[in-house]
């Protein structure tokens, strides 16, 4: 056990899906996993382990922002032997051609956070997803006939940013979605020798002000979840 996870040793599978919302973790476990059991509940950050088509998989919330998700990702990797983390979350779009509810596979993550500079001796660290996880996710999406976008995310430290002009810069550089965790998770995975990927569903559009409801974010976004789960099976087949 750790200060933040009260699961016993061996409670987690080697692959963990991580939404920000612990209630989304509960939804994923109850909807997609068989024989799912809750294995941790410290601070109501729920974690579950079950099987998907016979494959043992865990799901656990990571909270909001890089500090929170980094704690859980680090402890899962170093204390529970987790090898792969797939973040399944929401993001905001800044480009006009990116639409509400589209699925984005984040091959890289820009950020205004300094966490990766701290761990990388104040140099720029290229926060990127694992190639094999990315490839498997793209293949899973194609197999299910789900259109996805593949490209860069932006992990912001501030949800309510005062620098709205930065959205213009993001759009110029082709950023597909703004969220708050991917760069941190990629940094943790690199530091501790694990693999990581972020898959996001567009929950709101910063330009058009369209948005999904809190209930929709908690109980839908199934395409993203199915892509993540199927990608695990594809990854197993490819070794």
UniProtKB/Swiss-Prot annotation:
Its EC number is 2.4.2.1. The keyword Nuclease does not apply. A purine D-ribonucleoside binds at residues 4, 179-181, 203-204. GO terms for biological process: purine nucleoside catabolic process. InterPro entries: DeoD-type, Nucleoside_phosphorylase_CS, Nucleoside_phosphorylase_d, Nucleoside_phosphorylase_sf. Coiled coil: none annotated. The active site is at residue 204. It catalyses: a purine D-ribonucleoside + phosphate = a purine nucleobase + alpha-D-ribose 1-phosphate; a purine 2'-deoxy-D-ribonucleoside + phosphate = a purine nucleobase + 2-deoxy-alpha-D-ribose 1-phosphate. Keywords: Glycosyltransferase, Transferase. CDD domains: PNP_EcPNPI-like. The record marks 217 as: Important for catalytic activity. One of its GO terms (molecular function) is purine-nucleoside phosphorylase activity. GO terms for cellular component: cytosol. Phosphate binds at residues 20, 24, 43, 87-90. The keyword Flavoprotein does not apply. It is an enzyme of class 2 (transferase). Catalyzes the reversible phosphorolytic breakdown of the N-glycosidic bond in the beta-(deoxy)ribonucleoside molecules, with the formation of the corresponding free purine bases and pentose-1-phosphate. PANTHER family: PURINE NUCLEOSIDE PHOSPHORYLASE DEOD-TYPE, URIDINE PHOSPHORYLASE. HAMAP family: Pur_nucleosid_phosp. Homohexamer; trimer of homodimers. Belongs to the PNP/UDP phosphorylase family. This is Purine nucleoside phosphorylase DeoD-type. It comes from Glaesserella parasuis serovar 5 (strain SH0165). The lineage of its organism: Bacteria, Pseudomonadati, Pseudomonadota, Gammaproteobacteria, Pasteurellales.
